[in-house]
Each structure stands twice: as C-alpha cells, then as structure tokens.
C-alpha cells in the first residue's frame, strides 16, 4: 500500500562474521541469544546462521495452524516494512520480548532499508520465545512481491548472493494466515474473502505455497474494507476484494467474533475504525518510507480484551541509518 522508496543506503556489501551455530537441531538458546543481541544492533548474522535460523523457524511455524489460537494479553502490531529503527521504537513503547506478548500482522519486509535485519530479528525472537512472538503472513511475504519492492535486492547487496532471500522466502510459506485471540478477535493482514464464511475454511487451506494471484488465501492477504461498499467490490490493487459493513457483520456473527483486526493500509493516525468498530486497521510503520509523516500505533489487549492504543513516532534521525534526504517515491501499491 501507499508510497515506496528507493533503497540507496548501504549500497556496498556489509561485513558478515563467521557462523556461530550448526544445524537447526543444534541451535541452542545461547546461539539464539547471540543472534538476537547482534540483530538488535542492526548487524547482520552469517549466511550459515541465517540458514540454520530459518530452518528452526520453519520447524516451529509448521506446528502452528493456519489460524493461530492466541490467548490474551497480547499486543497487536501492523506493517513494519523493514523500518528497523522504528521497530526498536515499537519495542520501547510496547515492552521487550518476552515481557510482552506480540502478534505481528505481516509485511515485515520491503521498502524500508533494513528488511533483512528486521525479518531475521523477528524470526530469532520467534525461535527463542515461540509462545511470546506470533507472526502471520502479509502480502509482501511473497517471492514475487519481494523481487519488485526491495527485499530481494537488499539480500543481494548485503550478502552478495540470493541464498538468504531463498531461506527467508521458504519461511514465508510456513507463516500462518490469520489468528484469533480468546475466540473473539479475528486478526488477518488484509481482510475478508467472498470464498470464506468460517474460520474452519481458512484452517483447511494449503498455506505452504507462494501467495496465489487469486482465491481465498490471496484475499486474506490483499483485501481492504471500503466504507459504503455493499457486498464485494473489485480491489484497485488488482488482488483481493473490497468488503463492506455487511460482509464484516456476517463474518463476525457466523464466527462468534466481536472484532476483525487487520493492517495492510497506511493510516496517518496509526489506527482507524471501520463499520461501527467491527473492523480495525493498525499501522505500525511511522513516517512510512521515511517521507509520509504519519504516526504509528500498536494495540494492547489485556486479559479482558480491553483495548489500549499506543501511538509512537519515527525514531529520531540521529538514531537511524536512513538518509536525511527523502527518497523519491516511484510507485504505488
């Protein structure tokens, strides 16, 4: 969604140290803590360590269903898009892992300058604290999309080959498609599908594949709410659908949920309610693409599903590696 940026930072290969861990079954807590410590400094880990970490992440994600069942309390986060230093701001205001349980709604990569470090950090946290860090798939967790919008090129630039990109995109295929919190809050990256009436229909999708160009899996990752829309409309994105209050109400009633929480669209205020608070958009990339001027938000749900929004701004310029000059926006999605 919205404006994209040309990534001109760090155009030469970054220095990557020697691997510190072996096969995934030998990946120790100590190894993961070392990876997390390094990635929290926005430093790359060795290519072999990426391979091992991704293998471990796949093992964990493979045990999770298409619809993750999550208990409150939990903090819900929207798109990050490789804005590593803003992810650090998110953890400052939301609390560190494992003190806070997190659910990220996808779109970890593309457009920002640090998609590699961002995604690998989230994976390392997932591997270290699998019940505290929940990740679901966004439309940018896709081989095709990442070859266009920055992640593929970033992997080539930082590692000198496409191996890291291949390891990461294999993980994409294992990410869950949705989540449900306490049986009452349905979470998804994009939105609803005319092909899906019940969560059980999501549970039987074969998710371990590249995101299709159409169909229910595509719709979950690409659809958007549209005020005044009746039924289902064609999406200007070229994938997914526009859905209105009627479709949202029907889905909630059929599945016994009170709220549909999603990301996928830039919201200048960080979050936005739709359809009499049946649908909520959460956006967690402040000053999107280092030029949009928006704030970001996260949503904390307590043990009783009471909602508390936290608004935060982009990391100060002196704390980040992005150039001060606003990059040229050359495309929309």
Swiss-Prot record:
Location(s), subcellular: Cytoplasm; Cytoplasm, Cytoskeleton, Microtubule organizing center, Centrosome
- Kindly list any coiled-coil regions of this protein: none
Q: Where does Mn(2+) 1 bind?
A: 79, 81, 107
- Give the residues annotated as active site: 140
Details of cofactor binding: Binds 2 manganese ions per subunit.
GO molecular function, one example? protein serine/threonine phosphatase activity
Catalysed reactions, semicolon-separated:
O-phospho-L-seryl-[protein] + H2O = L-seryl-[protein] + phosphate; O-phospho-L-threonyl-[protein] + H2O = L-threonyl-[protein] + phosphate
What are the names of the required cofactors? Mn(2+)
Which Gene Ontology cellular-component terms appear in the entry?
centrosome; cytoplasm; nucleus
**What do mutants without this gene show?**
Severe embryonic lethality associated with a high incidence of male progeny. RNAi-mediated knockdown causes 20 percent embryonic lethality and 18 percent larval lethality. Abnormal meiosis and mitosis leading to defects in gametogenesis and embryogenesis. In spermatocytes, defects in the organization of astral microtubules. In oocyte meiosis I, defects in autosomal chromosome pairing resulting from abnormal synapsis. In embryos, RNAi-mediated knockdown causes abnormal mitosis due to defects in astral microtubules organization.
Q: What is the E.C. number?
A: 3.1.3.16
Signal peptide limits: none
Annotated phenotype, changing residue 262 to L:
Probable loss of catalytic activity. Severe loss of bivalent chromosome formation in diakinetic oocytes
The alphabetical list of record keywords is: Cell cycle, Cell division, Cytoplasm, Cytoskeleton, Hydrolase, Manganese, Meiosis, Metal-binding, Methylation, Mitosis, Protein phosphatase
Pfam families referenced in this protein's UniProt entry, alphabetically: Metallophos
What is the predominant subcellular site recorded for this chain? cytoplasm
PTM note = Methylation at the C-terminal Leu-333 is critical for interactions with regulatory subunits.
Function (record text): Protein phosphatase which plays an essential role in meiosis and in early embryonic mitosis. During spermatocyte meiosis and the first embryonic mitosis, regulates centrosome maturation, and thus spindle formation, by recruiting some of the components of the pericentriolar material (PCM). During oocyte meiosis I, regulates meiotic chromosome dynamics including synapsis-independent chromosome pairing, restriction of synapsis to homologous chromosomes, programmed DNA double-strand break initiation and crossover formation resulting in chiasma formation.
Which family does the entry's similarity section mention? Belongs to the PPP phosphatase family. PP-4 (PP-X) subfamily.
| Protein name according to UniProt | Serine/threonine-protein phosphatase 4 catalytic subunit 1
């Amino acid at each position: 969604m919205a404006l994209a940026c040309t990534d001109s930072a760090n155009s030469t290969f970054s220095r990557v140290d020697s691997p510190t861990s072996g096969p995934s079954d030998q990946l120790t807590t100590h190894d993961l803590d070392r990876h997390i410590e390094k990635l929290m400094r926005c430093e790359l880990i060795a290519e072999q360590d990426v391979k091992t970490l991704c293998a471990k992440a796949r093992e964990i994600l493979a045990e999770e269903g298409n619809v993750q069942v999550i208990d409150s309390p939990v903090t819900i986060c929207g798109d990050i898009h490789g804005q590593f230093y803003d992810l650090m701001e998110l953890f400052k205001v939301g609390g560190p892992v494992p003190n806070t349980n997190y659910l990220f709604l996808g779109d970890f990569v593309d457009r920002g300058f640090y998609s590699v470090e961002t995604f690998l950090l989230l994976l390392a946290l997932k591997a270290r604290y699998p019940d505290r860090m929940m990740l679901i798939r966004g439309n940018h967790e896709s081989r095709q999309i990442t070859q266009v919008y920055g992640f593929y090129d970033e992997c080539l630039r930082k590692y000198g080959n496409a191996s890291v990109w291949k390891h990461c995109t294999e993980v994409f295929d294992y990410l869950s498609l949705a989540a449900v919190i306490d049986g009452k809050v349905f979470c998804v990256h994009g939105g609803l599908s005319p092909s899906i009436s019940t969560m059980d229909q999501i549970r039987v999708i074969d998710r371990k594949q590249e995101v299709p160009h159409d169909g229910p899996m595509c719709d979950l990752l690409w659809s958007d709410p549209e005020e005044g829309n009746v039924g289902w409309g064609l999406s200007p994105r070229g994938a997914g659908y526009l859905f209105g209050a009627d479709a949202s109400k029907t889905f909630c009633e059929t599945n016994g949920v009170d709220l549909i929480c999603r990301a996928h669209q830039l919201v200048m205020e960080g979050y936005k309610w739709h359809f009499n608070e049946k649908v909520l958009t959460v956006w967690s990339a402040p000053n999107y693409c280092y030029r949009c001027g928006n704030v970001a938000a996260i949503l904390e749900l307590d043990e009783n599903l009471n909602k508390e929004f936290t608004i935060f701004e982009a990391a100060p310029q002196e704390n980040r590696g992005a150039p001060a000059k606003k990059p040229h926006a050359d495309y929309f999605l």
